[in-house]
Amino acid sequence: MARSLKKGPFIDDHLMKKVEALEEGGKKTVIKTWSRRSTIFPNFIGHTIAVYDGRKHVPVYVTEDMVGHKLGEFAPTRTYKGHGADDKKTKR
């Protein structure tokens, strides 16, 4: 279910402060965050945000198409290794 429009988008304050500080300084450093629940705002465009996936920080370069989505959508938490091999030869 989508978030109510009267509430507005959610973003953690500490993440917004870090992005604003980068914009003032003009530096292009990676921002580490554990906040997968934060919505991507237009002022994030062009920055790289390292989102925690439960094991490591996955670098996510924010583009214009990502605005309005959550940061966690771009850092998958599960790694798919593939299905098991067919063991028909060993069963004989």
Curated annotation (Swiss-Prot):
Q: Which InterPro entries match?
A: Ribosomal_uS19, Ribosomal_uS19_bac-type, Ribosomal_uS19_CS, Ribosomal_uS19_SF
Q: Can the keyword Ribonucleoprotein be found in this entry's annotation?
A: yes
- One MF term from GO for this chain? rRNA binding
Which Gene Ontology cellular component terms are annotated?
cytoplasm; small ribosomal subunit
Q: Does the keyword Aminoacyl-tRNA synthetase apply?
A: no
Top-level taxon: Bacteria
What Pfam families is this protein classified in? Ribosomal_S19
For this UniProt record, the keywords arranged alphabetically read as follows: Ribonucleoprotein, Ribosomal protein, RNA-binding, rRNA-binding
| BP GO terms, sorted | ribosomal small subunit assembly; translation
Q: Which PROSITE patterns match?
A: RIBOSOMAL_S19 (PS00323)
Q: Which family is this sequence assigned to? A: Belongs to the universal ribosomal protein uS19 family.
Q: Which HAMAP family does this one have?
A: Ribosomal_uS19
Job description of the protein: Protein S19 forms a complex with S13 that binds strongly to the 16S ribosomal RNA.
What name goes with this protein?
Small ribosomal subunit protein uS19
Natural source organism: Macrococcus caseolyticus (strain JCSC5402)
Gene encoding this chain?
rpsS
